[in-house]
UniProtKB/Swiss-Prot annotation:
SUPFAM superfamilies noted in UniProt: Metalloproteases ('zincins'), catalytic domain
Keywords: Disulfide bond, Glycoprotein, Hydrolase, Metal-binding, Metalloprotease, Protease, Secreted, Signal, Toxin, Zinc, Zymogen
Signal peptide positions on this chain: 1-22
Primary role: The recombinant protein has gelatinase activity. In vivo, injection of this recombinant into fifth instar L.oleracea (host) larvae results in partial insect mortality associated with the molt to sixth instar, with surviving insects showing retarded development and growth.
Species the sequence originates in: Eulophus pennicornis (Parasitoid wasp)
Protein's name in the database: Venom metalloproteinase 1
Short name of one Pfam family: Reprolysin_5
Any GO BP: membrane protein ectodomain proteolysis
Active site annotation, chain numbering: E364
């Protein structure tokens, strides 16, 4: 009798465990990450690929990319959620935003209560325009590295929800091969803080004929990038900047009157937590992982005037990129029309290195070029449920398309005719 009961119990337990296993398998297969590799990612690999800790819930797919080279065009195909994608990637139409020879420095906070800037012995000619490929249809910017005959794709496509593309780290590449890549969701906040700092009015109509060339002369925005992203190498941060700012540059391609181009004239990388005092002093006292976005701009006016004049004199605006959250959800801050002003040419964006800040960086540069929130103009910020404007006050992360409004395009054109935009006509680039 005891043996009979024991046998029944074992059979029941076996059936129960099998049922639980089936339920678990079904739930795994129905999840978004059903194409995850069967080898579990290590903590270091997860951080390297997604730029965040494993405690963060990230939606991603593990895909096999097939490529074909036809002259200078790369044909790329892959499948996500049963849907096939076929992209044509062409070499970037313009010079890379990060030319070979761009100054890269490090910043360290020393015990003398000051930030010291040091030259970094690092640059990489492989990240010039020949390595950047793009697709205007889905606003894709891809950095292609070719090593030993194998191509690796890292980048972002931002027409729809921000999607990052990442090649595999060494261990996984040895297991799965170089054709496998991760595609992951990298959407970030598009809610920001703006200040009106423009102090020079538009040029009077009777003087317009003297500077009419301004409206058609391309505007070159020379940017100094401040990277407060610790635990990343100079090589990796330079790669991130190349992809990130080429993606922003691509978003400005539809702007034609005047054309707007981005060039990075310097990168400064934080080497310790207090290196960038304008960010460090904007943190919340009760939680140092949170930052008050508006204070970064206020603090920056002093910080850049004190620490950067001796090192850099060839930039129209600085963009600080940091990974700290703002408890109010703000993803960026800047000053309207401040790009050529020595005290207002400051912008801040949140990005952890995953390209989640591409949209807000485009938005903030639009503000610096005197674009306002469309809700504050006669233009609607929502075309329909699927299309929002880039300068929407609080854009939708579910929109399938983002466009420049007619109000913003007019603001850019008018601003380019003023003395407040004079620096954008200067193509000087100090080597």
């Amino acid at each position: 009798m005891d043996l009979f009961i024991l046998t029944r119990f074992i059979l029941f337990l076996s059936f129960f465990m099998k049922s639980i296993h089936c339920q678990y398998s079904e739930s795994q297969e129905s999840g978004h990450n059903r194409n995850a590799p069967d080898k579990e990612l290590t903590t270091e690999e997860f951080q390297l690929i997604f730029h965040q800790s494993q405690t963060v819930d990230i939606e991603y797919d593990f895909i096999n990319i097939t490529t074909e080279m036809i002259e200078t065009e790369r044909k790329v195909s892959f499948t996500i959620d049963g849907k096939e994608y076929h992209l044509s990637l062409t070499p970037a139409a313009s010079q890379s935003v990060l030319p070979y020879g761009t100054k890269i420095k490090s910043a360290i906070w020393w015990t003398d209560n000051d930030t010291h800037i040091h030259e970094e012995d690092y640059s990489d000619e492989r990240w010039d325009s020949r390595a950047i490929y793009e697709n205007l249809e889905i606003m894709a910017t891809i950095l292609v590295r070719t090593e030993n005959g194998t191509s690796y794709y890292d980048g972002v496509f931002v027409k729809y929800s921000n999607e990052g593309v990442r090649s595999l780290p060494g261990r996984l590449m040895n297991i799965y091969g170089a054709n496998y890549h991760f595609v992951y969701d990298s959407n970030g906040s598009v809610y920001d803080v703006v200040l009106n700092g423009q102090d020079e009015p538009a040029v009077p109509a009777d003087m317009a004929s003297k500077i009419i060339f301004y409206s058609e002369t391309p505007c070159t925005c020379r940017l100094l990038i401040i990277q407060d992203l610790l635990m990343k190498t100079s090589r990796r941060l330079s790669s991130i900047s190349t992809i990130f700012w080429n993606a922003v540059n691509l978003r400005f391609r539809p702007v034609q009157h005047p054309k707007v181009n981005i060039i990075i004239t310097g990168i400064v990388i934080a080497k310790n937590e207090a290196a960038f005092q304008h960010v460090y002093r904007a943190r919340y006292s009760k939680n140092s992982k949170l930052v008050h976005t508006g204070r970064v701009i206020d603090n920056g006016r002093y910080f850049f005037g004190t620490n950067f004049d001796p090192y850099y004199d060839n930039y129209d605006a600085s963009f600080t990129m940091a990974s700290m959250d703002d408890p109010t959800g703000k993803g960026g801050a800047t000053v309207i029309g401040g790009i050529c002003s020595s005290s207002n040419n400051i912008a801040y964006i949140r990005d952890v290195g995953s390209y989640s800040g591409v949209k807000v960086a485009t938005h903030e540069l639009g503000h610096l070029l005197n674009g306002q929130h469309d809700s504050d103009t006669t233009c609607s910020e929502k075309i329909n449920d699927n299309i929002y404007t880039i300068m929407a006050k609080q854009g939708s992360t579910k929109a399938s398309k983002f466009v420049w409004s007619s109000c913003t395009l007019t603001a850019f054109a008018n601003f380019s005719k003023t003395t407040s935009a004079a620096c954008l006509k200067d193509t000087y680039r100090k080597q």
